[in-house]
Amino acid sequence: ELQPSKTNMLTLTLAWKDLQFISTYATVKDGISYIYDHYETNDSISFFQTRNLDRRYMNFSANYSPTLFKIWKPALQVNFTKPFISYNNQKYNKPNWYFEMDHLIELSKSFNVGCEIDYTTAGHTDNDVIYYFANSYAELYCIKTFLNNRLRFNLSVTNIFNTSREKWQINTNGIISNKWNDNNKRTFKLTVTYRFNESKSKYKGTASTDE
């Protein structure tokens, strides 16, 4: 029978101008994890179930988001996670790094271009026994507005280099399960949004918008 989880977390945040540091240490009592196991009377039959597992993890992140030359807004994020999880004398403790770099250039009040690039190293998550393989992603977009920002066009290209995949593995009780999802192909997308006239509520005086 599953027990309710209990989490104790300590977080420290330091910020100075455009720079921010965040560190977290957490312990989870009776956390919920997904486990593969053998059927009691037949080892050739395996099944998937949830179990309570105690775990701990540490997380450190640094964020830098300045405004340069009045129009360029880069944002850099570096994140490190170290889990501490064990089950049946097997450890699931491999740490992982996450890097993200965003760029937004405001060419005018009505025209912006930007990109997002991120990369994740292989490692275990902080909340389960799943092992994720390395993954990278890149996106490019431009936004143009008309009619005092009422009409908005957003043209984007997602997964530019076709490198983003969902690939992970669960290895418990001698049973290995792999998943490789290759459906996230490069995509060209155009989104058009129109915002209608704002009308004020006669009760609270707040503006409401229909899109």
State each model region's role.
Residues 80-85, 99-146, 156-162, 170, ...:
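C-terminal beta-barrel architecture of Gram-negative outer-membrane proteins
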Residues 10, 19-23, 72-78, 97-101, ...:
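Transmembrane beta-strands of outer-membrane beta-barrel proteins
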Residues 8, 16-18, 25-29, 66, ...:
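Transmembrane beta-strands of outer-membrane beta-barrel pores
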Residues 146-211:
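C-terminal beta-signal and adjacent terminal beta-strands/loops
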Residues 25-27, 31-40, 77, 85-93, ...:
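Outer-membrane beta-barrel translocator domains and adjoining extracellular loop/strand segments
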Residues 26-29, 45-47, 51-120:
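Gram-negative outer-membrane beta-barrel transporters
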Residues 1-29, 46-58, 67, 183-186:
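Outer-membrane beta-barrel signature, preferentially recognizing the C-terminal barrel domain
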Residues 10-16, 60-66, 101-105, 140-144, ...:
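Residues on the lipid-exposed face of transmembrane beta-strands in outer-membrane beta-barrel proteins
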